[in-house]
UniProtKB/Swiss-Prot annotation:
Major location (coarse): plastid
Full protein name: Cytochrome b6-f complex subunit 5
Natural source organism: Rhodomonas salina (Cryptomonas salina)
Organism phylogeny: Eukaryota, Cryptophyceae, Pyrenomonadales, Pyrenomonadaceae, Rhodomonas
Compartments where located: Plastid, Chloroplast thylakoid membrane
Family: Belongs to the PetG family.
């Protein structure tokens, strides 16, 4: 019972983590461009 639940949690966390990293990198890139760095 625990393994499928853990597998589902991991499958749910991976895309959220990737999207979070992408958004953070995009915001940092935009902020850097605004400051001319």
């Amino acid at each position: 019972m625990i393994e499928p639940l853990l597998f589902g949690i991991v499958l749910g966390l991976i895309p959220v983590t990737l999207v979070g990293l992408f958004v953070a990198a995009y915001l940092q890139y935009r902020r850097g461009n605004q400051f001319g760095l």
